[in-house]
């Protein structure tokens, strides 16, 4: 069995360099919610050094709230903004001898695209326009995954080690109880259940079916690095290969 481990980088966390030794894919902030041209260059350089797949992490234009504010923008605006961000990272990667492999939206852009078909279409169309060979990463079973498949893109369905799930397989919103899993044992058990058995227990007790092709590790938690190391070790014990 194989699984991809991804982390969001270039967002001001001190643990970026160490996380890049543990993950197989890096989602690099492109300036709209965090980061700038220099952090993008630095993250790309470290990803290449560690053999980690380079990906763009586009967002709504929302640096004030770290890309976590809901926005209702016209699809053409989202298309242009997404194309702008992924095009910038693709060029930075190419200039350093690397290749951008995937795109994963950030924050509220990711969450809204999971449920809003027009928004999902705008993102998928931008990814396809930039490079049809790019992989589109989205929440397992979401509108974004469906949109990517409609454009013929390779998609990668994502699950979260440290997020609570609702009965329909969507994430518990961050402003609601149960959104974040603080207990390491619970997060580890949830991750293994999703990867090995394709299901997750919701906060209301029901089992939701999920397809786990990539697991997101958040680098901003207090014990993020320790958990990442433990997860890698557990995967190795279970014979699960970590690779993009």
From Swiss-Prot:
The keyword ATP-binding applies. GO terms for biological process: carbohydrate metabolic process. Its EC number is 3.5.2.9. GO terms for molecular function: 5-oxoprolinase (ATP-hydrolyzing) activity; ATP binding. It catalyses: 5-oxo-L-proline + ATP + 2 H2O = L-glutamate + ADP + phosphate + H(+). Keywords: ATP-binding, Hydrolase, Nucleotide-binding. Catalyzes the cleavage of 5-oxoproline to form L-glutamate coupled to the hydrolysis of ATP to ADP and inorganic phosphate. Belongs to the LamB/PxpA family. This is 5-oxoprolinase subunit A. It comes from Shigella dysenteriae serotype 1 (strain Sd197). The lineage of its organism: Bacteria, Pseudomonadati, Pseudomonadota, Gammaproteobacteria, Enterobacterales.
